[in-house]
């Protein structure tokens, strides 16, 4: 059994932000931190006070996280980025909204005394003395303290206060992972209600000391338990009066949804998985109850999630093609008009969307990547709508004469024709590159539609059915929003965005088979008609070849593609292998090309290099971040592994930004999560000279000073399938609509009482719906008998509520 938490985060837009630049504008971006750990950075939107981001993320976390904070920053090229403001949502706040937090939130000023992080290790004892009881507080160590100095560290000490008496530990220089092992004693009086306050501070020689956080201990509770030892989370000082600046710093529109799940062992989900798979295998030949019922009881707002979960479950069982084929038949059975076929947000449409993103994303990158990159690099002004042509955006064609509107339109048409032609040519050449399971699925779709709508008058309908998914729901959205499909790291500027939009419209016209209705919508697209008309013929030829795949060819192609073992992640990184001697500087990193597969992390000078080194995946013990001070630069991670002789080794890799850092960490953690010998602790610093830079320990192979974060990952399109989690999510959905399922069961069984599943299947054959209700009942009992699924609270009962 495993407890898992996932955060869905959508950063929509900001408004009324203050101007930070001398131009009266700002260059805003967002940093998202979970418990003060940066995990996401949005793109920068230049020169605006009302930025639109529209970025979505799914973050997997341990259920013990406390808060997520959104920092709006202003990017500066020459100086440090300015902090505009922040929005902080605690775990309890998010959990109090079952459907998620959604709306505008005012930005507040960032108070240094509230920017605390880390934990402190304390041992607390009450023991009898000669005249009165004594309170003994041992301050052992701390970890992950906030760096307050410019060198990326702090000089921490601890101040312990009780009943007017104050004691302080020694100062540990340049460490966010200090060790003190100092003990203080105080006299306890009967009935005394005062709390014990333990504060961490950063010592400064010239300026005032910086607050690092505090813990308030309930002494009365400590009297009862007599002794307590553990890690206590540092809290901000909330006794200070806050400035009322809400609204002055602008607002941020967010969507945040928390999902907590208790995932049972695989054996508990087997009856549910077998039942659903049996229904799909029977297809339209069986009773056909469950899949239509699931669609019928699924609301519009959760249909995409349900479709994705079902698709991933059947993909893991090798039944994705059969599942989608069943949905195609169900949709066709209730469709009489060809112009509405697969145009609604049905379970079939949503499932195919998810299917293409899971199974076809690498194919999409291969076809669209070069064209999208060229559009971004050229940055040409492109416009076909005469009412939107602006001369100031055009520039000059010669030394003196600006271009006329007609010249702009003609040049724009030429540019778009070139891009569209290149895209269609790339698509025509990509038949063999398309995954076999995608080709086989489209083959089934093509055949089903042709069977449902035979005749010459419906000749184009099977082609339009395929393009409604391939072009309208996959290629066109990727062209319009390349960042959301991981084709680019940043959003397009206004000029490039307009070019992409026009190109996407042209692709849609080709996908619609150049129908008169699509032509009539925007007459100014007429200059592209020759290319669109030619593209229709190319696209029909491509689809004819795409769906021309037999079972044997499908298996052969699948085997060929699987032997290639596509990388989980790849790209250039900088590597440093420390020998522990001399200063470690960022300049000592060497640029190499890395490729992570399900077998190894390999690296070479170039992607095509024949000679490469590798780290076996089974030898990886942890993948974690490195303190900024260690190399004088940020975005460094470490891969801790063992060599063939079993000796521990560490490779330090530098990324170019926080997003790339977290993407690589996520990928490494996901593929190594089931390794034996994973570390529970590590050193976030480096071993320099004779000690660790983080905690100053002198034992190189000793226990780490910080806990590993193997469960903190970002969800990506190429994540490994998690069958148990998908089954749990499907169970959770079915549990939510159980009343509707019982209602349908009563209708089918002639008014039987709700909650009474037939118990004698030998006398009356138990239908699939009755079996499903029985499975849900068994899973509910399994969850009830397991430990509580709610996230654990703080391990210490001595923390006093701070207001």
Swiss-Prot record:
InterPro entries: C2_dom, C2_domain_sf, PH-like_dom_sf, PH_domain, Ras_GTPase, RASA4_PH, RasGAP_CS, RasGAP_dom
Region feature (Disordered): 781-803
Residues binding Ca(2+) 5, per UniProt: 149, 202, 204, 210
Keywords for the protein's UniProt record, in alphabetical order: Calcium, Cell membrane, Cytoplasm, GTPase activation, Membrane, Metal-binding, Repeat, Zinc, Zinc-finger
Required cofactor names: Ca(2+)
Residues binding Ca(2+) 2: 21, 74, 76, 82
Sequence positions that bind Ca(2+) 3: 76, 79, 82
Binding-site residues for Zn(2+), renumbered to this chain: 683, 694-695, 705
PANTHER family noted in UniProt: RAS GTPASE-ACTIVATING PROTEIN 4-RELATED, RAS GTPASE-ACTIVATING PROTEINS
Name of the protein: Ras GTPase-activating protein 4B
Provenance organism: Homo sapiens (Human)
Record gene name: RASA4B
């Amino acid at each position: 059994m495993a407890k898992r938490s996932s955060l869905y985060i959508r950063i929509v837009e900001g408004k009324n932000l203050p101007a930070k630049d001398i131009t009266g504008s700002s260059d805003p971006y967002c940093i998202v931190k979970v418990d003060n750990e940066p995990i996401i950075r949005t793109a920068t939107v230049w020169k605006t006070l009302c930025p639109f981001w529209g970025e979505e993320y799914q973050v997997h976390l341990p259920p013990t996280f406390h808060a997520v904070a959104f920092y709006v920053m202003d990017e500066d090229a020459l100086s440090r980025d300015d902090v505009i403001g922040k929005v902080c949502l605690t775990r309890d706040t998010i959990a109090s909204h079952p459907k998620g937090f959604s709306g505008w939130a005012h930005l507040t000023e960032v108070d240094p005394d509230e920017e605390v992080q880390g934990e402190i290790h304390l041992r607390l004892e009450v023991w009898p003395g000669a005249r009165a009881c004594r309170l003994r507080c041992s301050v052992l160590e701390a970890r992950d303290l906030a760096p307050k100095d410019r060198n990326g560290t702090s000089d921490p000490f601890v101040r312990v206060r009780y009943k007017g008496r104050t004691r302080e530990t020694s100062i540990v220089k340049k460490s966010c992972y200090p060790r003190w092992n100092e003990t203080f004693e105080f006299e306890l009086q009967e009935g005394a209600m005062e709390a014990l306050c333990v504060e961490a501070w950063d010592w400064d020689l010239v300026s005032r000391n910086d607050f690092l956080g505090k813990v308030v201990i309930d002494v009365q509770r400590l009297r009862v338990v007599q002794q307590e030892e553990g890690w206590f989370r540092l809290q901000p000082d909330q006794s200070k009066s806050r400035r009322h600046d809400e609204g002055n710093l602008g607002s941020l529109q967010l969507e945040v949804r928390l999902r907590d799940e208790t995932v049972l062992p695989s054996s508990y989900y087997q009856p549910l998985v077998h039942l659903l798979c049996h229904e799909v295998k029977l297809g339209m030949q069986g009773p056909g109850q469950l899949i239509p019922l699931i669609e019928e009881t699924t609301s519009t707002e959760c249909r995409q999630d349900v479709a994705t979960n079902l698709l991933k479950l059947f993909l893991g069982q090798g039944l994705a093609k059969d599942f989608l084929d069943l949905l195609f038949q169900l949709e066709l059975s209730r469709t009489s008009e060809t112009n509405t076929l697969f145009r609604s947000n049905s379970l079939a449409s949503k499932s195919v969307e998810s299917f293409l993103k899971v199974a076809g994303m690498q194919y999409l990158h291969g076809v669209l990547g070069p064209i999208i990159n060229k559009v971004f690099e050229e940055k040409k002004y492109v416009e076909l709508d005469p009412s939107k042509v602006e001369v100031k955006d055009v520039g000059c064609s010669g030394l003196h004469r600006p271009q006329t509107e007609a010249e702009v339109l003609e040049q724009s048409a030429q540019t778009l024709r070139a891009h569209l032609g290149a895209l269609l040519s790339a698509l025509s050449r990509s038949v063999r590159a398309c995954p076999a399971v995608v080709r086989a699925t489209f083959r089934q779709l093509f055949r089903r539609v042709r069977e449902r709508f035979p005749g010459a008058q419906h000749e184009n309908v099977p082609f339009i059915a395929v393009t409604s998914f391939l072009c309208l729901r996959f290629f066109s959205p990727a062209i319009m929003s390349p960042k959301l499909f991981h084709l680019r790291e940043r959003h397009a500027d206004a000029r490039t965005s307009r070019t992409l939009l026009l190109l996407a419209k042209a692709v849609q016209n080709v996908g619609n088979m150049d129908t008169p209705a699509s032509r009539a919508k925007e007459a100014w697209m007429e200059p592209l008609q020759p290319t669109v008309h030619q593209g229709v013929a190319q696209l029909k030829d491509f689809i004819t070849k795409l769906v021309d795949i037999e079972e044997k060819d499908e298996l052969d192609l699948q085997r060929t593609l699987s032997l290639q073992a596509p990388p989980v992640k790849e790209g250039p990184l900088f590597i440093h292998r420390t020998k522990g001697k001399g200063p470690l500087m960022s300049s000592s990193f060497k640029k190499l090309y890395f490729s992570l597969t399900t077998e190894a992390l390999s690296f070479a000078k170039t992607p095509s290099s024949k000679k490469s080194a590798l780290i076996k995946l089974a030898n990886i013990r942890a993948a974690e971040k490195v303190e900024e001070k260690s190399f004088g630069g940020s975005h460094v991670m470490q891969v801790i592994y063992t060599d063939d002789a079993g000796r521990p080794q560490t490779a330090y890799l530098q990324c170019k930004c926080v997003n790339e850092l977290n993407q690589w960490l996520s990928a490494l953690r996901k593929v190594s999560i089931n390794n034996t010998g994973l570390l529970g602790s590590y050193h976030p610093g480096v071993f320099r000279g004779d000690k660790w830079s983080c905690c100053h320990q002198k034992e190189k192979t000793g226990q780490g000073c910080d806990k590993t974060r193997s469960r903190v990952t970002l969800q990506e399109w190429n994540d490994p399938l998690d069958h148990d989690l998908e089954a749990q999510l499907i169970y959770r959905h079915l549990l939510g609509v159980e009343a509707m399922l019982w209602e349908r069961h009563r209708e089918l069984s002639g008014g039987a009482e709700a909650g009474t599943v037939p118990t004698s299947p030998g006398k009356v054959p138990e239908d699939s719906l009755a079996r499903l209700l029985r499975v849900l009942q068994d899973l509910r009992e399994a969850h009830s008998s397991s430990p509580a699924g709610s996230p654990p609270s703080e391990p210490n009962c001595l923390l006093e509520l701070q207001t």
